[in-house]
Regions:
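A phosphate-binding glycine/aspartate-rich beta-alpha loop in the early core of alpha/beta enzymes
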Residues: 1-3
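C-terminal cap/substrate-recognition subdomain and adjoining C-terminal extension
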Residues: 10, 14-163
């Protein structure tokens, strides 16, 4: 479980996370193109991840995302405690956040799109008006409206660009 994995990170210096963000993590090809195209059309963009806010908040700032949610690591004296704070972002939380933001923004769920790759994305994909499985596992692909198995995130935009 997420909590068990987080417990293994106990006493890891926060500086190690900075190294991972700067040198290890890479944006999926086409991410910047997709987000820029969405922004040109007034689309709100929300990142909901089972990962950690340390990374999603940086991505939100770097890419100009409207919203970002993830698991929040508890940090004391610059070190991880091995615990999470706040709500754990699991499959249900992802779907709930989609519904909450659609309601908050007065957008019918039928006008929302959710994209994911794993089983924990299925409730969100099913709650959305349109679900995209991106380089996804077979079970997730079976629950989506479309599947993108090759190429980058710009392929998502290309599905709608000429409609």
């Amino acid at each position: 479980s997420v909590r068990e994995r987080v417990a293994l990170l106990k006493v890891l210096p926060e500086t190690e996370w900075s190294y991972v963000y700067d040198h290890v993590l890479q944006l999926t090809a086409g991410a910047e193109t997709l987000i820029a195209a969405c922004k040109q059309h007034g689309v709100k963009f929300m990142l909901v991840s089972g990962g950690f806010t340390y990374f999603t908040e940086r991505l939100k700032s770097q890419l100009g995302l409207d919203y970002a949610y993830a698991n929040e690591l508890e940090i004391t004296d610059g070190k991880l405690t091995g615990k999470l704070t706040g709500r754990m972002i699991d499959a249900q939380a992802k779907a709930d956040l989609l519904r909450q933001h659609a309601q908050k923004l007065n957008i019918p769920l039928s006008h929302t799109l959710a994209m994911g790759d794993g089983a924990n994305d299925i409730p969100m994909i099913q709650a959305a008006g349109f679900g995209v499985a991106f380089h996804a596992k077979p079970k997730t692909r079976s629950m989506a409206d479309i599947c993108i198995n090759h190429g980058g995130l710009d392929a998502v935009y290309n599905c709608f660009a000429h409609k």
